[in-house]
């Protein structure tokens, strides 16, 4: 497997020593980025599945906690996220043609873990959108010994009164080739860049919000 060096922002990651982020290609040619951290005498490897609008460096602190416990980690920029290839010209839109396309990224990530000889057994820690991706991966036979899900996206909460409209809009926009457009009422900028800590709905940890 060809693992070409990719940009890696160690000062942003605040992760364990020896961080790096190679490029790799999914089976359909989409270029993605992974980030491994490996302590000496590791007891196994945790596959970190990020959520939407997240990226390798954001998991540096999580990797550091696991590193101190003698676990290697590897995380990923999903297609449309971080520094991975985009499906649309506007890099701010993390569009995918089909949600199952993420399984191609998972397969490439596992191949990278094997090529890097990351220690077994493998474990999975999946957050938000990564939880949705991770659940399908488990169903399809992801070779992990144990799993942790953090706020997994196993559904999208929609008020019962607006649900039929949302379903019709979602189906209809895809039918006419407009499935890449933002839903009404949403913003193109990432939530964390537009909401102050006091008003945010994602975390009660001020240090992590600032990080």
Regions found by a protein language model. Name each.
Residues 1-26, 30-38:
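An N-terminal hydrophobic leader/cap segment in hydrolases
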Residues 38-45:
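Proline/glycine-enriched tight loop/beta-turn segments at coil->beta junctions
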Residues 47-51, 127:
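The conserved beta1-alpha1 loop
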Residues 56, 63-89:
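Conserved alpha/beta-hydrolase
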Residues 94-114:
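Alpha/beta-hydrolase active-site loop
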Residues 116-128:
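Alpha/beta-hydrolase fold nucleophile elbow
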Residues 129, 133-211:
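Alpha/beta-hydrolase-fold enzymes
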């Amino acid at each position: 497997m060809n693992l070409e060096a990719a940009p890696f922002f160690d000062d942003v990651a605040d992760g364990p020593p020896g961080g790096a982020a190679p490029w790799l290609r999914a089976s359909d040619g989409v270029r993605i980025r992974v980030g491994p951290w490996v302590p000496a005498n590791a007891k196994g490897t945790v596959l970190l599945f990020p959520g939407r609008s997240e990226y390798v460096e954001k998991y540096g602190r999580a990797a550091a906690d696991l590193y101190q416990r003698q676990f290697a980690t590897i995380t990923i920029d999903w297609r449309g996220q971080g520094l991975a290839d985009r499906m649309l010209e506007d890099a701010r839109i993390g569009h995918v043609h089909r949600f199952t396309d993420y399984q191609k990224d998972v397969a490439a990530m596992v191949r990278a873990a094997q090529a890097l000889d990351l220690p077994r057994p493998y474990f999975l820690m999946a957050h938000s959108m990564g939880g949705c991706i991770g659940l399908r991966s488990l169903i399809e036979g992801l070779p992990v010994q144990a799993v942790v899900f953090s706020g997994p996206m196993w559904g999208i909460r929609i008020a019962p009164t607006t649900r039929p409209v949302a379903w019709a809009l979602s189906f209809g926009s895809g039918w006419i080739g407009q499935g890449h457009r933002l839903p009404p009422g949403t913003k193109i900028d990432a939530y964390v860049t537009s909401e102050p800590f006091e008003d945010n709905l994602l975390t009660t940890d001020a240090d992590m919000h600032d990080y």
